[in-house]
Amino acid sequence: IERGKIMTEIDMKGNPFFLDEEGENWVLDTWKNMSLEQKCGQVFCPMGFNGEEETLKHFTQDIQVGGLMYRADSAENIQDIYRKLQAFSNIPLLLAANTEAGGDGLAYEGTSFGKPMAVAATDDPENGYRMGYTACKEGAALGLNWSFAPIVDINYDFHNPITNVRTFGSDPKKVLDF
C-alpha cells in the first residue's frame, strides 16, 4: 500500500467497523487533518491512575492518546473519569479494563465470577458465556468499550504465573468452548 493510502485501502464498511458513509468520511477527514504527533499519540493506551482533571486533560489534550486503561475503582469514580475523558478528547477514546473474571475488573461493585479456570471447572460453557455477557453489560454501563477478555491463552505451563488460573485450562477444546 502506498504511503498515505492506507486509510483508503481499509474496508471500513465491513467487519469489524461496519461504518456507514458518514462514519467513514469522519474517519478519513479526521485522519487527514491529524498531525504526525497526533497520529503517534493515538497508538498509546497508558494506565490511568487517578481522576484529576489536570491529568485527564494531559492524556487527552497534550498527548492525545488513543485510549486509557483503568484498574477497578468505585463504579461512580470510573463512570465520572470515563465521561470526563471522552468530553476532553477530540477523538472518541478506547476505554479499557481487565474484565476477565467479571465486571469487578472495572468496578468494585461489579459481579465476580471467579477466575476463568474456576468457571471452566463447572464444565458448563454457558457459565463462560454468562461471565462474558455480565462483564460486558456492566462495563458498557460505565463507559467501557475495550475489554481485555476473554482470556484465550492455553495453560500449557502450570508454573507460568501470568496465565495459570487466568485461563480456562490446558485443553484447547475446553478453552474454545468457554
Regions found by a protein language model. Give the residues of each.
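Enzymes and membrane/adaptor proteins characterized by extended Gly/Ser/Thr/Asp/Glu-rich
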Residues: F49-E52, L56-F178
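Preference for extracellular/luminal or secreted protein segments
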Residues: I1-D62
